[in-house]
Amino acid sequence: MQNQRIRIRLKAFDHRLIDQSTAEIVETAKRTGAQVRGPIPLPTRKERFTILISPHVNKDARDQYEIRTHKRLIDIVEPTEKTVDALMRLDLAAGVDVQISLG
């Protein structure tokens, strides 16, 4: 797997969960002898929703809600076979979305 690169993108709503998952991935990759670049924090996406509280009148009565999507990027340079095998066996938290691309 020479001259390869594995790019891992993580997304989660909870920043503690995504930091824990990135730490597990980085520790696993370093333990198997691969070079790791990152974790690189990407911009947090904030979605805001405004909802009217009253059913009929009082347009001034509103609630605002926010969902934050935290993102991290990890590059694994020159991964070995052991690295790929260990990453495939890694059990991450349920609230973390993982996208892996080879390049």
From Swiss-Prot:
Keywords: Ribonucleoprotein, Ribosomal protein. Coiled coil: none annotated. It comes from the Bacteria. One of its GO terms (cellular component) is ribonucleoprotein complex. Transmembrane segments: none annotated. Pfam families: Ribosomal_S10 (PF00338). InterPro entries: Ribosomal_uS10 (IPR001848), Ribosomal_uS10_CS (IPR018268), Ribosomal_uS10_dom (IPR027486), Ribosomal_uS10_dom_sf (IPR036838). GO terms for molecular function: structural constituent of ribosome; tRNA binding. GO terms for biological process: translation. Belongs to the universal ribosomal protein uS10 family. Part of the 30S ribosomal subunit. Involved in the binding of tRNA to the ribosomes. This is Small ribosomal subunit protein uS10. It comes from Buchnera aphidicola subsp. Schizaphis graminum (strain Sg). The lineage of its organism: Bacteria, Pseudomonadati, Pseudomonadota, Gammaproteobacteria, Enterobacterales. The gene is rpsJ.
